[in-house]
């Protein structure tokens, strides 16, 4: 049984807040690699940033996602992922970037649990910060790109309702229990 549970959606939809709550509850979680790449690149004065070199940024995310998958699949326990390699494919579509065959192959080969939880755009909680420079319209387009990307790779999506963090966590855990994933 695949026990790697993915959260996806546009930026600023509450994925990371739910991940933080799951960590508090004792669950293993894989943090979002996009933010990690941005922080590293800013610290190094690098170019692999979404506002400098989108292809290099995507390629760095793919490398990190592969490492994440390899590390966390060995835990043999439930792990929640704040995005995964399929998001890199969706990002490529969103930004009209050329998609290398290696990325398509990796999305086919590196698998996560089905279903995937998708967080819809939620303007009331959307906010920019040092790493998130997109506006809400881009968040909506990102959400649509993720729907297409995950469907392309055969994942069922469960939309997480817009409600409190605790209610979202309970919603997710109940769906996983219903499917006997926990």
Where are these regions (language model features)?
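Walker A (P-loop) phosphate-binding loop of P-loop NTPases
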Residues: 12
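Conserved substrate/cofactor phosphate-moiety recognition/catalytic segment
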Residues: 23-64
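Pre-Walker A (Motif I) flank of P-loop NTPase domains
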Residues: 1-4
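Conserved lysine of the Walker
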Residues: 15
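Hydrophobic anchor at the beta1->P-loop junction of P-loop NTPases
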Residues: 7
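A glycine- and Lys/Arg-enriched "phosphate-lid" helix/loop adjacent to the NTP-binding pocket
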Residues: 96-163
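Glycine-rich phosphate-binding loop used to anchor ATP phosphates in small-molecule kinases
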Residues: 58-111, 126
């Amino acid at each position: 049984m695949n026990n790697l549970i993915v959260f996806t959606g546009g930026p600023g939809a509450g994925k990371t807040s739910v991940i933080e709550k799951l960590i508090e509850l004792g669950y293993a979680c894989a943090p979002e690699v996009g933010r990690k790449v941005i922080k590293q690149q800013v610290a190094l004065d690098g170019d692999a940033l979404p506002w400098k070199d989108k292809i290099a940024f995507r390629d760095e995310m793919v490398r990190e996602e592969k490492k994440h998958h390899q590390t966390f699949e060995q835990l043999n326990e439930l792990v929640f992922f704040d995005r995964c390699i399929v998001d890199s494919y969706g990002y490529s579509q969103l930004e009209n970037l050329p998609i290398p065959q290696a990325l398509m192959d990796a999305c086919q080969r590196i698998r996560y649990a089905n279903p995937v939880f998708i967080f819809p755009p939620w303007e009331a909680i959307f906010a920019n910060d040092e790493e998130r420079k997109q506006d809400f319209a881009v968040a909506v387009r990102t959400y649509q790109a993720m729907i297409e990307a995950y469907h392309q790779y055969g994942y069922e999506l469960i939309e997480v309702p817009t409600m409190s963090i605790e209610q979202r966590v309970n919603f997710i855990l109940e769906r996983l229990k219903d499917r006997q994933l926990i």
